[in-house]
């Protein structure tokens, strides 16, 4: 491609509404333009990158036998009503009526549509397993779109769906998809982790997320420094290796006036925060379903994990704290609640290992020191209800946990029969009887990958695209840029053009920057866009039969022969 025939839409100034590095650089480098909140145009430079991601994703989906389809973005509401998600999904689902007053939605995902397709096309167990995928735009009416294409309202996604007659078949395809995702993100040169995750609004019973590690990520992920263990902090298991020691103190109430927090009490009593406990009262129910309050107890230095706490059978979902009126009726005072309670008491593992600890005294402005389980208070059940912390033991017994921010770029689910049962999607089994299909769904944020890659790879001059194992998988819109310096002699342009033609013939994605701009402008643009290899052709260097070569990642100038240049740009 010749730059004089290509839209270079670079900007010197950083857009005022671009809030993270990737959104700033994608606009400045001329990859995208914003037309409304959460809505973007992909310019020619950016579309080249998007299409590269799509190609790699498509190749790996086809490698595991997935068949490509294309479903409409507009979906009839009755499909969503069959599964109950028309009302349950929330305001992110854009609902509208056509001119005939029929209800439709703009698809944020396609479980209902693909299940409807399977219901109409699949007849026998002999057709299974089967996997369909598409690469298509989705729409979610985000309340606050931000971070550029990272959290846009309209975005490009690869979504795949598999159908099976049994769980064993689903598990096999799930593993194949997991491996395919690993290959995709490895080919793209991303530093990523696959983590155990919650199934969320999609539903199902097994789930993994794929996260690109970046400080700007919205999710906290925990992973071992010595093994492959990784999990979303929401699900990472907390391990307590400490054993409860015998009591050495008598219990005693002490005055803690205007000290409703563990931090204030620990400082006042000159004790470690980890020797205090906090008691939270939440709404729950008896085994018979009658309303009751329950208590959850954690160490003072730990944070309640809502998702884990919701797994307590007696807790209401979503987890809801007791109201002021409910606390008052129970004779309790927020900030001073103890562990001796006339209700079920669920204690986190770490808190259950404490002895001689400090708790509330169930009396305003008082706490109790020297508290011990069994002697002074009973535990209904020991549970895992806290977030893990940096340095905690890894649950697999190998190493310690590291916690970093991650950008979710992929998510896979074993859905089971949630959608197929709701939509009566069955096939004839080997005994002739109808079998409700098992399903898996597998998503990749194609446009989000680009933002995540930039978050992980940038410097003060612009984008530095990830180093990929194969140059053909590079995300850069062009792998090589040739810059002919202005000269009175035609030799410079002729040589640059000949090199350009030769690289094209070798299959290298090359740009000839023949724009009528100063060299400094060209160099700045190429660094901003992140072209990995830059070759400068000039009178002075041609006199020595040399070319100036610069790699985007080290910017050190090298004078190389033609053969050396070709070796540089075709092997990395």
From Swiss-Prot:
Any Gene Ontology biological process: prolyl-tRNA aminoacylation
Record bears the keyword Membrane: no
Keywords associated with the record: Aminoacyl-tRNA synthetase, ATP-binding, Cytoplasm, Ligase, Nucleotide-binding, Protein biosynthesis
GO molecular function: aminoacyl-tRNA deacylase activity; ATP binding; proline-tRNA ligase activity
SUPFAM superfamilies: Class II aaRS ABD-related, Class II aaRS and biotin synthetases, YbaK/ProRS associated domain
Subunit structure, interactors included: Homodimer.
InterPro entries: aa-tRNA-synt_IIb, aa-tRNA-synth_II, aa-tRNA-synth_II/BPL/LPL, Anticodon-bd, Anticodon-bd_dom_sf, Pro-tRNA-ligase_IIa, Pro-tRNA-synth_IIa_bac-type, Pro-tRNA-Synthase_IIa_type1
Cellular compartments annotated: Cytoplasm
Protein EC: 6.1.1.15
Main location: cytoplasm
Pfam families: HGTP_anticodon (PF03129), tRNA-synt_2b (PF00587), tRNA_edit (PF04073)
Cited function: Catalyzes the attachment of proline to tRNA(Pro) in a two-step reaction: proline is first activated by ATP to form Pro-AMP and then transferred to the acceptor end of tRNA(Pro). As ProRS can inadvertently accommodate and process non-cognate amino acids such as alanine and cysteine, to avoid such errors it has two additional distinct editing activities against alanine. One activity is designated as 'pretransfer' editing and involves the tRNA(Pro)-independent hydrolysis of activated Ala-AMP.
Domain remark in the UniProt entry: Consists of three domains: the N-terminal catalytic domain, the editing domain and the C-terminal anticodon-binding domain.
Domain of life where this protein originates: Bacteria
Recorded catalytic activity of this chain's protein: tRNA(Pro) + L-proline + ATP = L-prolyl-tRNA(Pro) + AMP + diphosphate
Keyword Membrane: no
Main EC class the enzyme belongs to: ligase
Record-stated family: Belongs to the class-II aminoacyl-tRNA synthetase family. ProS type 1 subfamily.
Protein's name in the database: Proline--tRNA ligase
GO cellular component: cytosol
Matching CDD domains: ProRS-INS (cd04334), ProRS_anticodon_short (cd00861), ProRS_core_prok (cd00779)
């Amino acid at each position: 491609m010749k730059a004089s025939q290509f839209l270079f839409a670079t900007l010197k100034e950083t857009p005022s509404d671009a809030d993270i590095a990737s959104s700033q650089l994608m606009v400045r480098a001329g990859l995208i333009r914003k037309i409304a909140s959460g809505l973007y145009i992909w310019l020619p430079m950016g579309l080249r990158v998007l299409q590269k991601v799509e190609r790699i994703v498509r190749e790996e989906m086809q490698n595991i036998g997935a068949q490509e389809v294309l479903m409409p973005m507009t979906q009839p509401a009755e499909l969503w009503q069959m599964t109950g998600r028309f009302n349950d999904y929330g305001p992110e689902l854009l609902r509208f009526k056509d001119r005939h007053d029929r209800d439709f939605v703009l698809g944020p995902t396609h479980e209902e549509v693909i299940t409807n397709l399977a219901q109409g096309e699949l007849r026998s167990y002999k057709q299974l397993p089967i996997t369909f995928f598409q690469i298509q735009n989705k729409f979610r009416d985000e309340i606050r779109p931000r971070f550029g294409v990272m959290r846009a309202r309209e975005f490009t996604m690869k979504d795949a769906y598999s159908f099976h007659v049994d769980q064993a078949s689903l598990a096999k395809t799930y593993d194949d998809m997991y491996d395919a995702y690993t290959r995709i993100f490895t080919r793209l040169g991303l530093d990523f982790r696959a983590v155990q995750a919650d199934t969320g609004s999609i539903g199902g019973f097994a789930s993994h997320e794929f996260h690109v590690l970046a400080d700007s990520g919205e999710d906290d992920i925990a992973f071992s420094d010595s093994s492959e263990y990784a999990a979303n902090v929401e699900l990472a298991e907390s391990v307590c290796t400490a054993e409860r020691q015998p009591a050495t103190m008598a219990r005693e109430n002490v005055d803690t006036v205007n000290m409703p927090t563990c931090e204030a009490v620990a400082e006042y009593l000159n004790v470690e925060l980890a020797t205090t406990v906090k008691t939270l009262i939440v709404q729950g129910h008896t085994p018979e379903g009658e309303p009751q309050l329950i208590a959850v107890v954690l160490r003072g230095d730990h944070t309640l994990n809502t998702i884990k706490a919701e797994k307590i059978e007696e807790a209401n979902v979503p987890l809801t704290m007791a109201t002021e009126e409910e606390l008052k009726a129970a004779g309790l005072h927020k900030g001073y609640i103890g562990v001796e309670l006339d209700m079920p008491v669920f204690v986190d593992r770490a808190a259950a290992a404490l002895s001689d600890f400090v708790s509330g005294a169930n009396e305003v402005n008082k706490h109790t020191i020297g508290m011990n389980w069994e002697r002074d208070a009973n535990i209904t059940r020991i549970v895992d209800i806290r977030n893990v912390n940096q340095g905690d033991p890894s649950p697999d017994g190998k190493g310690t946990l590291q916690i970093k921010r991650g950008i979710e770029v992929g998510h896979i689910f074993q859905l089971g029969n949630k959608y197929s049962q709701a939509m009566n999607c069955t096939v004839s089994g080997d005994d002739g009887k109808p079998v409700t299909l098992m399903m898996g769904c597998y998503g990749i944020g194609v446009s989000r990958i680009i933002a995540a890659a930039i978050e992980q790879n940038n410097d003060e001059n612009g984008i530095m695209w990830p180093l990929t194992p194969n140059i053909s998988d590079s995300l850069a819109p062009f792998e090589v840029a040739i810059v002919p310096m202005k000269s009175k002699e035609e030799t410079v342009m002729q040589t640059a053009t000949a090199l350009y033609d030769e690289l094209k013939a070798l299959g290298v994605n090359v740009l000839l920057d023949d724009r009528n701009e100063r060299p400094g402008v060209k160099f700045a643009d190429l660094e901003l866009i992140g072209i990995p290899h830059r070759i400068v052709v000039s009178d002075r260097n041609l006199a020595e039969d040399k070319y100036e070569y610069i790699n985007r990642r080290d910017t050190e100038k090298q004078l190389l022969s033609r053969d050396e240049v070709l070796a540089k740009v075709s092997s990395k």
